[in-house]
């Protein structure tokens, strides 16, 4: 399992190992940021790193544009699939269409005993399939499944670009409010129907409807949502890591994301700066770009200075295959610190 922490807590490896040392249930690590900054690469490299440590890990992609299959060079699906070469590393690429079908079937099963509401809610579900945000709702139901499970030591979420992710992570609050209103409605309806059964001759037609059971199911759903929200806001079990590139648009979008995540109570413990041009480049264009990047690093330090900041250089090759991911993991988790130390020295000048 994991060795004792030897490095400083002010490193990505340090905060990761500290979080994993405490055996209080499954841990959750999320990677987010602007599109194209390397979220999937960091998710995959982290999965490989933790699997190499002996942990049972699943990487769950909530991004409809799945890239994990390209990085690992194998096909994945809606259910956990082992990564080739590992018995303890799995990948799930959530299929929005399948997730929506499962979501609808689950809701239909819960309302089939209530003919009064059944037709109305079924029409509502069909309309929901065409509504904006449905992907997030359906994916969130799959997300809840992994939040409820103790099958894995670590669940890594490879999230969609920032806007989608913020809507997705706002689901617990939205659904909690919705469930609270629905429970209130069911309680009112239960009392009303019981009164009607006593007053009207046709009131007995709903005698097969078990309102108490329906209410119990709603309460269970609400408890599940609240539990997920509590885990998401627990810094002992959950960490959100922003991935940025040293460009102004990426930095500003990540700053906005950080503020929104803080509003939801989701702990951000690190910022990963990706695609840094190495110091030893020879061409004038590359050196000029590196100087610009160093200025942007000052901006990153200013905006995210209270977070752990890790640095990953621009690679000479594509981020594909297990061996490349192992190399990225070594850089990311502090086993190759020379470039990071040089960057820190430059930024500090």
UniProtKB/Swiss-Prot annotation:
Keyword Membrane: no
Highest taxon above the source species: Archaea
EC number(s) given by UniProt: 7.3.2.7
Positions contributing to ATP binding: 33-40
Classification via Gene3D superfamilies: P-loop containing nucleotide triphosphate hydrolases
Top EC class for this record: translocase
Protein name, as recorded: Putative arsenical pump-driving ATPase
């Amino acid at each position: 399992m994991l060795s004792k922490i030897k490095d400083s807590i002010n490193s990505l490896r340090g905060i990761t190992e500290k979080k994993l040392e405490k055996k209080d249930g499954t841990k959750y690590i999320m990677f987010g940021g602007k599109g194209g900054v390397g979220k999937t690469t960091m998710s995959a490299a982290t999965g490989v790193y933790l699997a190499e440590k002996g942990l049972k890990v699943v990487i769950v992609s909530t991004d409809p544009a799945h890239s994990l299959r390209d990085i690992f060079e194998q096909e994945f699906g809606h259910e956990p699939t082992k990564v080739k070469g590992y018995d303890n590393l799995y990948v799930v690429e959530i299929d929005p269409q399948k997730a929506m079908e499962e979501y609808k079937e689950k809701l239909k099963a819960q309302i089939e005993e209530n003919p009064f509401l059944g037709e109305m809610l079924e029409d509502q579900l069909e309309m929901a399939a065409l509504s904006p945000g449905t992907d997030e709702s359906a994916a969130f139901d799959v997300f809840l499944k992994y939040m409820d499970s103790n099958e894995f030591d670590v669940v890594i979420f490879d999230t969609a670009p920032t806007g989608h992710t913020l809507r997705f992570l706002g689901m617990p609050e939205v659904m909690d409010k919705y469930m609270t209103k629905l429970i209130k409605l069911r309680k009112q309806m239960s009392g009303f129907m019981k009164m009607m059964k006593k007053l009207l001759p046709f009131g007995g037609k709903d005698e097969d409807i078990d309102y108490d059971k329906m209410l119990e199911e709603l309460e269970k759903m609400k408890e599940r949502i609240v539990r997920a929200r509590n885990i998401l806001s627990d810094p002992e079990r959950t960490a959100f890591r922003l991935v940025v590139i040293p460009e102004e648009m990426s930095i500003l979008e990540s700053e906005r994301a950080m503020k929104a995540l803080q509003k939801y109570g989701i702990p951000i413990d690190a910022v990963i700066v990706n695609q840094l041009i190495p110091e030893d480049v020879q061409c004038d264009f590359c050196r000029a770009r590196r100087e610009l990047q160093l200025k942007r690093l000052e901006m990153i330090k200013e905006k995210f200075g209270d977070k752990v900041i890790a640095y990953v250089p621009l690679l000479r090759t594509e981020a594909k295959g297990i061996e490349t991911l192992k190399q990225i993991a070594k850089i990311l988790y502090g086993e190759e610190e020379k470039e990071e130390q040089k960057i820190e020295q430059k930024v500090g000048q």
